[in-house]
Amino acid sequence: MKTTHLWSQEDEEQLIRKLVNNFCDLINRSEEEGLYWTGLKCDLIELAHIVWETGQLTDQQGRLMDFQSIVWHICRVLHVRVPCNPSSVVSSVRARKNVRVGPLRERYLQLIVDAKIQDPMRLEIRRRRR
């Protein structure tokens, strides 16, 4: 049985804005701040791809950041080993069939709409205890 989507275009746009803002904030941080990604690495790479698709992240010279750079920066800050080929990770995630876990975008939208969690990505980031 197929699930019904209970979110609007506005909900999707809100999610994308939140993700872009999170990435802008995070890639400018230092790994010494002790932030750690606790979710799946493939989810983080998929998030990076969603953000890259918006074309809204720029480097210090004002040029659009490429996908590899976004992945490198976010993995550095969140203490995740950078995959050799991030694009293949995205391809693998999108090619999955018959999995119990739905697409990341849908999971995050469900958290926003049903659980009233405004920033689902932040649930998967923890700070190292000092």
Feature annotation, model-predicted:
Residues 65, 77-130:
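Alpha-helical oligomerization segments
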Residues 41-48, 67, 101, 105:
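Short runs of predominantly hydrophobic/aromatic residues within well-ordered alpha helices
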